[in-house]
Amino acid sequence: LALGASPIMAHAEEEVETLAAHAGCLVLNIGTLSTPWLKSMELAQIAAKKNKRPIVIDPVGAGATELRTHAAQAILEHGGITAIRGNASEIAALAGSGGTTRGVDSTLESDRITQEASTLAKQYDCIVIVSGAKDFVTNGVHTCMMEHGDAWMSRVTGMGCTATALLGAFLAVNEDAFRAAIHATLFMGLAGEWAHKSGLGLGSTKVAFIDVLGDPQEQAFPKILRYSWA
């Protein structure tokens, strides 16, 4: 909402197809996974795919349990995925390289699985975003590495899901999925840095983060961005 998007969280089978068909982007987040929701996600995914809507999956906790790993893999196999965003362990689990997840936290550093992320992007013809101390965005051919953000972001619940929602908002208005993913990831990191400078503690820093999402000021962002290509 702060960014200007208008999200709606729907799980009922009776409405997900209609909503997904008309949404700017469908975000499938398995954070609060339950078996009945899997059918709703499948219906929403089919509708979004049929209507050529971008689809994002956040495989929260993939690698922590078989249910989460298999659910995320099933969503990928259904097809039509535009982007996958997760931490290093979640992406490694989807790539089948044995990543383990501690709750929603990664046990791997993001720069250790760049090859797995690239392979996953090629396999499903999508964009893969690996979040961490360094963020990586790859389309399977080119990879952009960004070094923005702040350590406080890993200490507040929901920041990963926020990054995924932000990605969905950017994809809804930019048909170039690779560019949209890079811009969303950069903006998330830069907003986190600015919030750290403005906040006094974790609570006020999160409020400051929402402030910059709602009213990004030019002075809040550095003139030189820290990124590289591979």
Q: What are the language-model segments listed below?
A:
Residues 93, 157-187:
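Short, small-residue alpha-helix embedded
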Residues 2-52, 57:
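Active-site cofactor/substrate anionic-group-binding motifs, chiefly glycine-
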Residues 37-86:
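Glycine/small-residue-rich loop that forms an oxyanion/phosphate-binding "nest" at active or ligand-binding sites
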Residues 67-143:
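Conserved phosphate/ATP/ADP-binding segment of small-molecule kinases
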Residues 118, 144-157:
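Short pre-catalytic strand/loop immediately N-terminal to key active-site residues, enriched for Gly-Thr
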Residues 190-230:
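Charged C-terminal helix
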Residues 116-121, 177-192, 209-210:
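Short, well-structured alpha-helical segments that form the helix of a local strand-helix-strand
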Residues 33-36, 61-65, 136, 153:
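Short, small-residue-enriched loops and turns at beta-alpha junctions
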